[in-house]
Amino acid sequence: MISKPVDLPVDVVGAYLALRGEHEALQAKHAIAVAEAANAQAMLSDNEALIVALELKIEKLRRELRGQRSERTARLLDQLELQLEELVAAATEDEVAAQAASARTSSVRSFTRKRPVRKPWPDDIERERVVIEPPTTCTCCGGSRLSKLGEDVTETLEEIPRRFKVIETVREKFTCRDCEAISQTPAPFHATPRGFIGPNLLATILFDKFGMHSPLNRQSARFKCEGIDLSTSTLADQVGYATAALMPVFDLIEAHVFAAERLHGDDTTIPIQARDKCTTGRIWTYVCDDRPFGGTAPPAAIYYASSDRRGEHPQKHLAGYGGILQSDCYNGFEPIAVAATKAVPITFAFCHAHARRKFFELADIQKNARDRKRRGKPISPIALEAVKRYDELFEIERQINGLSAEERLAVRQEKSKPLFDDMHEWLTKERAMLSRSSEVIEPIDYMLKRWEGFALFLKDGRVCLTNNAAERALRSVALGRRNWTFAGSQRGADRAAVMLTVITTCRLNDIDPKAWLADVLARIADHPVTRLYELLPWEWKRASAATVMLAA
């Protein structure tokens, strides 16, 4: 480095060139360091996947030798298979990152994972030969005297509604009679690097795993029953590539969601496999859906995964958001509402379905009759009255669903406000007369302490009475827990969040997720970065409809 005045060139140009050369040298060193770190991470992820794969083999051999058929052993094998699935996908993601980092240098060789040799396709599988139109002139000199030299064949496994075929993409080679140069059409893009699985089949694998909650080991078993040998690690490899490929779309959906003026937010539990035990993680979702008040913005949902429910997670998610947040009364949201820390503060609108549910649990006659702990206890008349009052409010909401925000607000001011004001007066009066041991104190305090947030629907017609939009978005996670039991790792939960984002957003826009995935995975590799917005589900739907109209 140039550190002494005597080392500096006399002329300004020389000094500039020296500084520029030093800057470029530092950039090169930084790129090398980043590439080496990425390679090290890729090697570490590969070794972790290898260790779990060997543990799985050992456990299977031990089971065969000792004849163990216990439920515990079967569960252990399932856990190892799911953990291996997540580690292989993580190793593939790290390999992609290492390749990208190494491409920026000329001295660091990218780490490449060792993969098992792919087994040949069955002899009786259907094959379709697709010949790319060859060049008519020499790509070197422009001559037209071409003669066929040979051909390269790329085999891609594709799905045709549970019927499989191998597409042989032929690229014929031609040699020029004039200059002896060889001409050949460039190889086509694959949905994933080095991928031998077509976009339609890849879309099915992704949708079955994240949309229908079928783990990859079950999918592998199903493929084997149909005569196709695709191991769990092979499928996980493709899932890792596909998730990385879809990240730009995830980022665009994220930007769209947090640009909304009003959001629904909620979370649910998700068991995450750790080294020694399962931890209780969380899946968070934020949904923008303006259809209840006639809004024209496309609906969308974004998901995140975390290892716990600490408030730092939603605070990080919503750090750049300003507007209305409809949620439950989780106190982890509270710090983000401080106006001094945000240009546009967050205003909370609490869910009345949560509040009503607390009263309903004390007024549910059938449930109380089944509950041994409450046997003999009378139904709370206050809770029953609160449920009846809420039912009147919800009936008004059903009548104004889909109207404009202004129309909704006008109806609420006329019909809902008198009911809600009277409810506040009644709850305050009843609360003052209750003893500390009364069970109904909890739901009353739940509302009275947060009354401003519960009353926001009377001031803004955009606000919904419930947070059902977010709860519906998390319903698939609750259903999935019954099938896959737990996420194989934290990174596996993160991948699930990415795929849930695109699949749920497709569903919110009445789009077949498999059709969208198949088309986007086939196009995204060579789609211009400046036009990535065209792949957003609602833009894709608009373009598809226009294409159908032109064809008609």
Curated annotation (Swiss-Prot):
Disulfide bonds: none annotated. Keywords: Plasmid. The keyword Transport does not apply. The keyword Acyltransferase does not apply. InterPro entries: IS66_C, Transposase-related, Transposase_IS66_central, Transposase_TnpC_homeodom, Znf_dom_IS66. It holds the Pfam family DDE_Tnp_IS66_C. Belongs to the transposase 25 family. This is Uncharacterized protein y4hP. It comes from Sinorhizobium fredii (strain NBRC 101917 / NGR234).
